[in-house]
Design a protein with these regions (language model features):
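Active-site metal-binding loops of divalent metal-dependent hydrolases
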Residues: 13-14, 64-67, 109, 140-141, ...
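Metallo-beta-lactamase
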Residues: 81-96, 100-112, 122, 127-187, ...
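Residue-level marker for the onset of beta-strands and adjacent loop->beta junctions
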Residues: 47-49, 175, 194-196, 262-263
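Conserved beta-strand hairpin/beta-sheet module of binuclear metal-dependent hydrolase folds
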Residues: 2-92, 197-213
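Hydrophobic/aromatic beta-strand patches that form the interior of the parallel beta-sheet core
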Residues: 9-11, 105, 136, 171-173, ...
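Metal-dependent catalytic neighborhoods of phosphoester/phosphodiester hydrolases
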Residues: 114-125, 265-266
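Cap/insert and terminal regions of metallo-dependent hydrolase folds
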Residues: 76-88, 201-279
């Protein structure tokens, strides 16, 4: 779709499943299961909705999904359902291949956001999947990924960024920065301290990617926060700041993990926030 002078597309990596209890934290199962029905292993269906932006000569991909480097054991654990590769999705939806992407941005380096940064060659070595792209990651996130805590260590897989460092394609950015005119990455703490969200502003319109602050439409209520969040109180505060603004200014919002409706608009009704479909 056109967004001001830019073209914007949602590029799905694949479907997968994570434990519903972990995804909804302290929210009781009898509540979250009404909006995100679990399977027989208590896992809920999710997607990875990467954002493609064509801005002049720049072809930008924000997040790269879970990737295709997984052993069969983990494919089963996460119920990874890949109907086509990220490169095939790019070609089908955006009309370009991976080699034509010029900038890759990771909101953070968790494996479900950075897994497609690299791919395996015939010898099983991880190499950059976007051979002609610069990769942007916040310096704080990179430093945390290099020395994670015991609580989130399993979310960081070095093969998703070390090959980028070795190839010279990785560029470390500060907390808030402009990618191209109108597109900024801004840090919002909660999920961790260094996750960044994209904000695209064109002709008075705003597109905002919530990354893992509001991973699905079901997470819009302030208190519906993931158990994965390192700083859940800060997630709530960020949502209290951003959601009213999104409703007031009629933002187009991207929900990275929503399996059915990646884009929506926030609206307030009777003191609660909801999501309307973007036509």
């Amino acid at each position: 779709m056109r967004f001001g002078d830019y073209r914007v597309e949602v590029i799905s990596d694949c479907e997968f499943r994570l434990d519903g209890g972990a995804m909804f934290g302290v929210v009781p199962r009898n509540l979250w299961s009404q909006v995100s029905p679990p399977d027989d292993q208590n896992r809920i269906l999710m997607n990875m909705n990467c954002l493609f932006i064509e801005a002049g000569e720049e072809r930008i991909l924000i997040d790269t999904g879970i990737g295709d480097k997984w052993a069969e054991k983990h494919r089963g654990m996460y119920a990874i359902d890949r109907r086509r590769s990220l490169d095939e999705s790019l070609r089908a939806i955006a009309g370009i291949g991976a080699d034509e992407v010029t900038i890759v941005i990771n909101t953070h380096l968790h494996f479900d956001h950075a897994g497609g940064n690299t791919e395996l060659d015939d010898a099983g070595k991880a190499l950059p999947a976007f051979k002609n792209a610069r990769y942007f990651v916040s310096r704080a996130e990179y430093e945390h990924a290099e020395a994670p805590s015991d609580r989130d260590r399993a979310s960081y897989l070095p093969e998703n960024w070390k090959p980028l460092k070795q190839s010279g394609q990785l560029e470390l950015k500060e907390a808030n920065y402009e990618v191209v005119p109108g597109l900024r990455m801004e840090t919002h703490a909660g999920h961790n301290r260094s996750m960044q969200c994209p904000r695209l502003e064109q002709d008075g319109e705003t597109l905002f990617g919530f990354a893992d602050l509001v991973p699905t439409r079901a997470h819009v209520p302030f208190a519906w926060v993931m158990g994965y969040d390192l700083y859940p109180v800060e997630t709530v505060e960020a949502k209290k700041k951003l959601l009213p603004q999104a409703a007031k200014e009629n933002w187009t919002c991207l929900f990275y993990h929503d399996p059915d409706q990646p884009l929506g608009r926030i609206f307030e009704e009777d003191g609660k926030y909801h999501v309307a479909r973007v036509s």
